[in-house]
Amino acid sequence: MMKLNLFINANETESYIDIHAPKMNDNVQSIINAVNDLDKSHTLVGYIDKEIHIINVSDVITFQVINKNVTAITSNQKFKLKLRLYELEKQLPQHFIRISKSEIVNKYYIEKLLLEPNGLIRMYLKDAHYTYSSRRYLKSIKERLSI
């Protein structure tokens, strides 16, 4: 059972959160991730031809660089973005994982993983396609997915 204390003090100049725990565990990590995600973007602007769309970030399966353009792929649409992948990576919530130089994946859409003999990870996504991680990001991917 976790206990919550809230202290409102008009003399404070900024809001902050202290976490007191006997040890680091999944609940504590979930709280940290949720707090870190508060300042992250939850919507993005995407383009299909000359149409401008507001995209809910949680609907995005993957962000890929296609023909030098960053593309947000949802279950039924592909949207071009005006951001670079590294800029996007800074704005996204914790459940997005950089898996290669040209792709960021929403971990909630990963269905299964296959470790390839060459050391890469093949990721099967819920939209029935798969993608590969690059070796450079392998350690980070394993940490983020707890494998």
Curated annotation (Swiss-Prot):
GO terms for cellular component: cytoplasm. The keyword Transferase does not apply. Keywords: Cytoplasm, DNA-binding, Transcription, Transcription regulation. The keyword Glycosyltransferase does not apply. It comes from Staphylococcus aureus (strain COL). This is Uncharacterized HTH-type transcriptional regulator SACOL2360. It comes from the Bacteria. Pfam families: LytTR. Induction: Up-regulated during anaerobic growth. It is found in: Cytoplasm. Residues 44-147 form the HTH LytTR-type domain. Its main location: cytoplasm. InterPro entries: LytR-like (IPR046947), LytTR_DNA-bd_dom (IPR007492). GO terms for molecular function: DNA binding; phosphorelay response regulator activity.
